Amino acid sequence: MFQRRIHVAINGIPKYKGDSETICKHIIQNCWNGSFFQVSTGHFSLFYIRDFGMCIDALLRLGYQKEAQKTLQFALTVYSRENRITTTISRNGIGFDVFSYAPDSLAFLLYSLRVSKNKELVEMYKPFLELQISHFYNTVVDEKTGLVQSGRNFSSIKDHAKRSVSCYDSCCIAVVAREATMLGLKNPFVNTYSYKKIQEKIKETFWTGDYFSDCEASDIITGDANVFPYWFRIFTDRKMIIKSIAAIQKQKLDQPLPLKYTSFIPKNFFFPLELVAPNYEGNSIWAHLGLCYIDVVASVDKKLARKYVQEYKKQIEKHKNFLELYNPEGQPYKSLFYYSDAGMLWCSKWFVLKTL
């Protein structure tokens, strides 16, 4: 990353020719390396199940069925060989977690298998998947509450932050419980907390009446807590979605473009991040979070969703690339040691959203 920071300082970020559509087409093609879809053409040229899961619907709609299936085959080959599901896999097929076990890894894997209709892969890896669901249940779930275990720092969408019993992680429990059943896999949740019970517990614990709070012991309004309960389709109530959008807008998390995690810079980050990339996951603007937010907005307000899509179009054509994140003012994020990654696979989501 630091090596790339030096390269960007000297040469700038790579620039693609053409309009926003042409740029995104080239990026998606370049993110396919023959074995799997990597997250970016920059320093994150790795496999992340979270990012792939966010993009799989768009990739399928864009005609990348074979590539998506090969990506899942690649991931399951590595996962089953190592007998674990990790956040990340290197280009040479080594799995590792950034920075610890993440509840959303299994959630996005099961989700991806279902939406891609990969019944053969599910059947082939059924014993392994069922073992991992059992491991997830024993590692993540608090049997007294049906939510994530308290006092544990799981890796998450904000992988540099220390959070306990977050709304996002608890939503991942609901996803695993639901997807396991839908895929016909042995499901330990049916004996304790059913999907419906987990759904009810999430609402009881995190829903304030106007928005989802970030964590069990916090009433902070965050972007991820008010996107993924809906993006995962755990909740589809139109009135709830509209209230969460209003809460996001009140905190200006969608300005100058969506979406920020918080309206301020929290203090709950692991120490090294503050030195290398200050405000990396604070009130900086994340494109993947923004695109998932636009997915949710589109379900209730297509006019607003189109406005957000146009804002990203301007950024794509301005930088001739699709960037990872921006500072709070909407400029490419940079620090002494880090510069926003580019050539993000996430642009596949924008490519589909532009047709709204």
Placement of each model-derived feature along the sequence:
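Catalytic cores of carbohydrate-active enzymes
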Residues: 18, 44, 82-88, 144-155, ...
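Low-complexity, Ser/Thr/Pro/Gly-enriched N-terminal "stalk/linker" regions
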Residues: 1-47, 69-70, 74, 83-84, ...
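Active-site acid/base region of carbohydrate-active enzymes
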Residues: 5-23, 62, 80, 113-168, ...
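Short, solvent-exposed segments of well-ordered alpha helices
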Residues: 39-46, 93-100, 160, 164-167, ...
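Aromatic-rich carbohydrate-recognition surfaces in CAZymes
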Residues: 45-143, 170, 287-293, 297, ...
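C-terminal hydrophobic structural anchor segments
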Residues: 283-286, 290-323
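Structural helix-adjacent loops and short alpha-helical linkers that scaffold large soluble proteins
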Residues: 11-17, 59-72, 114-130, 181-196, ...
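Generic long, charged, amphipathic alpha-helical segments
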Residues: 262-283
